[in-house]
């Protein structure tokens, strides 16, 4: 579904256009395999916040194994958000973030792709949903052509912004 905007959409933009059925918000470089069928276990009170797997060659590698030098943990990274039915979130247009330029905290648009945005969203979602990370049951596959990263002007780490960690759960398919 397209969001009519001339800028990167905010999380609230995505939430506002959600409909009945399964709604998936994902980074543009994410794909799924047949394991996506396991989203059928989602209910209206649960959000799936999935940690990605890296596609290295022809092999899927867990997030934390693909980034060992960064000390990455799977609960600190989500690239996909799944909901059943209209998403019950409000006030997700802006967020407080640290400016790498000014060295101060300031309000910025709350968009996908800013370091820490997934953790801030996790904390917000926990106020309305049971948030689970069944990444062992639904493969969220990261297709990043190279490992170069664009420097970010802001980051959502520390300071006044609340973070949430969503650890992967090895939950039986019948109850994901």
Residue ranges, per PLM feature:
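Active-site-proximal specificity loops/subdomain of glycosyltransferases
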Residues: 1-26, 31
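A short acidic, often aromatic-flanked loop/helix-cap motif at beta-alpha or helix-coil junctions
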Residues: 3-9, 55-58, 139-141
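Conserved catalytic core of nucleotide-sugar-dependent glycosyltransferases
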Residues: 15, 30-123, 127
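A structural signal for short, well-ordered beta-strand segments and their strand-loop junctions
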Residues: 23-25, 47-50, 130-137
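C-terminal catalytic/acceptor-binding lobe
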Residues: 94, 99-103, 107-176
């Amino acid at each position: 579904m397209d969001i009519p905007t001339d800028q990167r959409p905010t999380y609230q933009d995505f939430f506002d256009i959600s409909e009945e059925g399964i709604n998936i918000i994902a980074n543009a470089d994410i794909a799924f395999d047949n394991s996506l069928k396991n989203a059928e276990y989602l209910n209206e009170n649960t959000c799936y916040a999935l940690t990605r797997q890296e596609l290295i060659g022809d092999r899927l590698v867990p997030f934390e194994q693909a980034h060992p030098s960064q000390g990455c943990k799977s609960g600190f990274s989500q690239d996909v958000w799944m909901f059943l039915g209209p998403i019950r979130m409000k006030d997700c247009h802006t967020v407080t973030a640290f400016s790498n330029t000014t060295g101060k905290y300031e309000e910025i648009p709350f968009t996908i792709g800013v370091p820490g945005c997934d953790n801030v969203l996790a904390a917000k979602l926990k106020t309305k949903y049971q948030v689970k990370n069944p990444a062992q049951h639904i493969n969220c596959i990261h297709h990043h052509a190279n490992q170069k990263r664009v420097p970010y002007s802001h980051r959502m780490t520390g300071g006044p912004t609340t973070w949430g960690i969503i650890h992967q759960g090895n939950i039986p398919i019948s109850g994901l």
